[in-house]
Amino acid sequence: ITSNTLSSSKIFQKIKFKKTIHQFFPIDTNFFIKKFLNYWKPSAAFFIDSEIWPNTITNLKRNKIPIILINGRITKKSFNKWKKISYLSNDLFSKINLCFPSSKQSEKYLKQLGVKKIKFIGNIKFSQSINEKLLSSNINIKKFISFKKTWCASSTHKTEELLCGAVH
């Protein structure tokens, strides 16, 4: 599991998932992202909330690594900023293989920005039955991954490490 903060690393150390390690995710530059991907060779990348890292997403796609956005969230302000550079954002957002938006509004924005495969299951942060919703969503996440042991959850927050561990 990857994250960008010391606090999330400390939380991960307390949980102690078996057969799982924590790695800090690199800064979103081509040089560091390429080195990271070449070393870890993830089979899929899971992003949570509003994490849109252009260089990371571009390099993941270039390496044919599926990109899944969980609880995808985008504000009106952010949507308007992305729309101003639609010549870049449409290409970037179209690289996302699968998106579970957190709200109907985010679903609308993400579609307009270029995400093609979207399945709305609600905001999983407030869900009591995350696993049930994901399993009953009729989306087979396994077809997007090749069953390697390495994967990436970039820039997670305090409450998201448990979900990442459960998914892994």
Segments the model singles out, each with a brief description of its role:
Residues I1-L135, T156-K158:
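Active-site and donor-binding regions of nucleotide-sugar-utilizing enzymes
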Residues I130-H168:
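Conserved catalytic-core segment of nucleotide-activated headgroup transferases in glycan assembly
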